[in-house]
Swiss-Prot record:
Belongs to the KduI family. This is 4-deoxy-L-threo-5-hexosulose-uronate ketol-isomerase. PANTHER family: 4-DEOXY-L-THREO-5-HEXOSULOSE-URONATE KETOL-ISOMERASE. It holds the Pfam family KduI. The gene is kduI. GO terms for molecular function: 4-deoxy-L-threo-5-hexosulose-uronate ketol-isomerase activity; metal ion binding; zinc ion binding.
Length: 278
């Protein structure tokens, strides 16, 4: 398990490229027949991926000592979205079929969570976020059809996109975790522009569905002190509450967003006009 500390905005704006990447970029999300795990001190979110190819992969129980618990989800909830082939998630003996672009919410207290692929030639790829939880809500599978969609932007501004909200209060109850998948319309390259911050929660962007030559210029930093990260396929960016989070790709891409904090109201954000950015 990698650990990322919180960082003050005054410190962040002094970092060079290597420093920004070290603090905010998660370069490797998937490893065959294993899971990855990055623990951020920012709202205590955990981010990672599970790639079961030739065997099932159980997540996280060996990190109990680092988390101060006897098993991974003793005091946490988890959301996973499959971006690969058809897969299975078994939660304490109950099996869920999770296809491409389908999600599973797992409530606090689940003792064993096991991930597997149906076809090793086309393995499932489960991207997950986990957040501290104070109570137990029911496990729930969410399909793309069951997600709450919202289309924003315009072709003229190259930012037309559909925000598919999988794990939000309109779809199911959680303690604090929210997750969704945003698809850009053909020809659109910008996400979340005009941009925003949200003081009451942090966010992680996971970029995928990109070929080897594609990169996303991910904008971050305070609105008057912007910086950027070059992000490639299947990499994630941690965004503190004080930072904008927006990106433009050299070609098409898709991304999953996950938020943790004290407020789950999707529209609770502070919008920033493009003219105000520096």
């Amino acid at each position: 398990m990698q650990v990322r500390q919180s960082i003050h905005s005054d410190h962040a704006k002094q970092l060079d490229t290597a420093g920004l990447r070290r603090e905010f970029l998660i370069e490797k999300i998937f490893a065959a027949d294993d899971y990855t795990m990055t623990y951020s001190h920012i709202d205590r979110i955990i981010v990672g991926g599970i790639l079961p190819v030739s065997k099932a992969v159980s997540i996280g129980n060996e990190v109990g000592k680092q988390l101060g618990v006897s098993y991974f989800l003793e005091r946490r909830e988890l959301g996973a979205i499959n971006i690969g082939g058809p897969g299975l998630i078994v939660v304490d003996g109950q099996t869920y079929d999770i296809g491409n672009e389908e999600a599973l919410y797992v409530g606090k207290g689940a003792k064993e969570v096991k991930f597997s692929s149906i076809d090793r030639a086309n393995p499932a790829k489960f991207y997950y976020n986990s957040a501290p939880a104070h109570t137990t809500y029911p496990n729930k599978k969410i399909t793309l059809a069951e997600a709450s969609p919202q289309t924003l932007g315009d072709d003229a501004t190259s930012n037309r996109r559909t925000i598919n909200k999988y794990i939000v209060p309109d779809v199911l109850p959680t303690c604090q975790l929210s997750m969704g998948l945003t698809k850009l319309a053909p020809g659109s390259l910008w996400n979340t522009m005009p941009c925003h911050t949200h003081e009451r929660r942090m966010e992680v962007y996971f970029y995928f569905d990109m070929d080897e030559e594609t990169a996303v210029f991910h904008m971050m930093g305070q609105p008057q002190e912007t910086r950027h990260l070059l992000v490639h396929n299947e990499q994630a960016v941690i965004s503190p509450s004080w930072s904008i989070h927006s990106g433009v790709g050299t070609k098409r891409y898709t991304f999953i967003w996950g938020m943790v904090g004290e407020n789950q109201v999707f529209g609770d954000m502070d919008h920033i006009a493009v003219s105000e950015l520096r």
